[in-house]
């Protein structure tokens, strides 16, 4: 068996958490299963995998509205897929127009909650429809046409989804750039996309202070010759320079525009957006997604995995600068006609109870966030959520990285009242929607993402293209295409082929390599182990970084952990752990030894961290992923490379030199 298959599971999670029967029976997926006559969840998942074209056809008919029906579900010429051939659609029609012209016209689409306490706004579907139409007409007045790119560099304010939807409506391609990126990060993305227009704001709020954003755009577009216009939202009232002939205020652009705008009837393969992935060196990867797939994948998974219903108040805390914001703040919930929270600010401003106060005030019933936030709340203590009434919560969900078992238990008990299932989701910018996740009916193992969702043929391969046995790990692959899959890298077909399809091309052409690895335990539950290159090689054993980190976090004094391998002449690598302690815990040499012993007791001697450091923070992306590449480079005295994607670049200095 190839070496990747030898990444064995060191620890078996035996705890099972079952969902209350009323939540199961209420869930969208359970009701579909019963309607179809399946007796078990396993039977349903297997049928949907084997009959994936029939399944996706039904999802496309259920969750999307088509101007013209498609005549062919899929044309698959690996590595290129075309879905819903012959049809006509537009995701803006599905997300906004059809609701504004139905009984939902006065239903709330977004409760906007600004960072300043009390800065709130309610936006109905009809109001959203009018705002999108005005902005769409505004963009057209600036010369934006079908296929043109529009870069969006905004904080989490209503104008962000409005501009995304306005682009979609007229067939323009949006490219959202996270507002935390510097001018350099923005410039590379605007230049690569050849954006005609950039939409930004004067500034944004961070922990109560208005900070400028527009100057980053001014700097970035100096070296972006494609940019003709810059549209500026007046958010914080800062005095910013406006370049005559190029810059225009958002409110001036839209104020006299008609509140009606024709929605382009598009081919399902027409591009909806380009989103640049970050965190690696070199040129950013512009991942292309299409209208047809985004009319289906995010809506289906919002309904099935997150179990969002008509009467729910749903909150995904992600920023729209990332794929989670695209799929689960904008397109998924809006295509369902759901009511969502749109929150601008930090999770702990003005205090660490801010999110819980929003859940209490708005009666949030489905709450989707990231492990890094959950661990931050754990560190602050149980007393904070206890101050608030969180009984409205029915479903919890997690995204961004594996949710370690201790954080799972804390989240379920303290936020979910010991009742709410936690939908721990694995997916990627490239997949467009959830791929592996429990359904509300799934018995859950803390730390596991359970099973591939209905409609996906997902497997774990060794390097020779063999499906690995239970108890072993390897590379996550997709054996068949799916509607919301990436269509290409923007103007880089060679990289697209090399990165995702080349690995198994000679053995099983059309096999998608995700770049992440996973294991399956004896019960078939999936455990995400991080990136393919995130593996420790200790004395001939291959050990997952994530598994060692999870063991460290199960120590009562530890809030968060990151581990790397340090080269060693004898063992190949020795394990080095960087530990963030819980509030009030005192650092000591004895505690370092105790944490190392604890990891050994949980995972065995092979996983013993020979070196333990206490740090205040570790480098993470804005989506909460620990940047082990950066930690390892800094610790070993090597160049750290591109750190523009870090949420906390100052944390790099916390990492000591260990050579």
Swiss-Prot record:
Transmembrane residue ranges: none
Catalysis performed (reactions): acetate + ATP + CoA = acetyl-CoA + AMP + diphosphate
One Pfam family matching this protein: ACAS_N
Keywords annotated in UniProt: ATP-binding, Ligase, Magnesium, Metal-binding, Nucleotide-binding
GO molecular function, one term: ATP binding
Record's keyword annotation contains Glycoprotein: no
Top EC class, one word: ligase
Binding, ATP: 400-402, 424-429, 516, 531, 542
Single Gene Ontology BP annotation: acetyl-CoA biosynthetic process from acetate
EC number, UniProt record: 6.2.1.1
InterPro entries: Ac_CoA_lig, ACAS_N, AMP-bd_C, AMP-bd_C_sf, AMP-binding_CS, AMP-dep_synth/lig_dom, ANL_N_sf
Function description: Catalyzes the conversion of acetate into acetyl-CoA (AcCoA), an essential intermediate at the junction of anabolic and catabolic pathways. AcsA undergoes a two-step reaction. In the first half reaction, AcsA combines acetate with ATP to form acetyl-adenylate (AcAMP) intermediate. In the second half reaction, it can then transfer the acetyl group from AcAMP to the sulfhydryl group of CoA, forming the product AcCoA.
Record-given protein name: Acetyl-coenzyme A synthetase
Organism: Methanothrix thermoacetophila (strain DSM 6194 / JCM 14653 / NBRC 101360 / PT)
